[in-house]
């Protein structure tokens, strides 16, 4: 199976590393060679740390890196069996990418997006193959986190769902099948918790440290909601909250003003 990934950021490079570590050859695409080189260097650094800690052998690291190839040209995707888009969370950009891919890739190619909250069905509608369009939502850091949300759009075929579930399992991941809905499963529960933590802090109820410790010790969470928001990125949290609020129109999903203020200030 020829697997191609678009994007060299945290998620893009992480997804590439996850496939490569599962001994699956993968092509990583970006507009610039510099971005590709930076992503490969990041993956190499990650693997080197694992070797130094004795968690993987040098031979395994070498084999993993050998599974990764790079390109700046969409023409390399013509014979791809699966293309995963891991670009930034902008609907317009995702539509632009898949409109272009639809012209280049063979009719059998499965398209997947790693979106954390946007509509699979809406992105799929810009292509001629909505039955072969699916969500494949990895979690950060992708090489480590076991979960993959497999999201079925309005027209995604059962056959494609089965193929992607099997692929995720073959990678060593645990996939969950999700019918498309705003935020899917994890982010519909998780991100409002981060938003509420910000609200509790803004109301002067407790300090950042005490809010996080309360949830770690009281709810057995490995990380508090405010630390988690910093890990995810407050800009990402805001984008997901806005999707939830716009789709449901429910005040419980309204982004807290402090979250908006921090994002505007560049405190991500």
PLM segments and residue spans:
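Structural motif
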Residues: 6, 29, 64, 71, ...
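Rossmann-fold dinucleotide-binding core
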Residues: 110-180, 184-188
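Helix N-cap / loop-to-helix initiation motif
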Residues: 32, 57, 157, 206-210
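NAD(P)+-binding Rossmann beta1-loop-alpha1 motif at the extreme N-terminus of oxidoreductases
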Residues: 1-49, 53, 69
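Rossmann-like NAD(P)-binding element
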Residues: 35, 49-110, 117-118
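NAD(P)-dependent Rossmann-like dehydrogenase/reductase catalytic/cofactor-binding core
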Residues: 22-24, 162, 169-180, 202-203, ...
């Amino acid at each position: 199976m020829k697997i191609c990934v678009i994007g060299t950021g945290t998620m893009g490079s992480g997804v590439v590393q996850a496939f490569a570590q599962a001994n699956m050859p993968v092509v990583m695409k970006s507009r610039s060679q510099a971005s590709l080189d930076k992503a490969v260097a990041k993956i190499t650094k990650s693997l080197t740390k694992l070797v130094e800690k004795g968690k993987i052998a040098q031979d395994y690291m070498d084999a993993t890196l050998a599974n990764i190839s790079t390109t700046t040209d969409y023409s390399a995707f013509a014979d791809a069996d699966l293309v995963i888009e891991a670009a930034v969370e902008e609907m317009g950009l995702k539509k632009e990418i898949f409109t272009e891919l639809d012209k280049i890739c063979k009719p059998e190619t499965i398209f997947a997006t790693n979106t954390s909250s946007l509509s699979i069905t809406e992105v799929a509608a810009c292509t001629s193959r909505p039955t072969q369009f699916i969500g494949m939502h990895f979690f950060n850091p992708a090489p480590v986190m076991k979960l993959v949300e497999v999201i079925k759009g309005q027209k995604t075929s059962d056959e494609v769902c089965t193929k992607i579930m099997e692929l995720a399992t073959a990678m060593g991941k645990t996939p969950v099948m999700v019918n498309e809905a705003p935020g899917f499963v994890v982010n519909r529960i998780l991100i409002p918790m981060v938003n509420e933590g910000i609200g509790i802090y803004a109301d002067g109820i407790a300090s950042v440290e005490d809010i996080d410790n309360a949830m770690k010790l009281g709810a057995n969470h490995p990380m508090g909601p405010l630390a988690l928001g910093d890990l995810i990125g407050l800009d990402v949290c805001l984008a997901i909250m806005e999707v939830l609020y716009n789709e449901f129109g429910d005040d419980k999903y309204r982004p807290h003003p402090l979250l908006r203020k921090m994002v505007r200030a560049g405190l991500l």
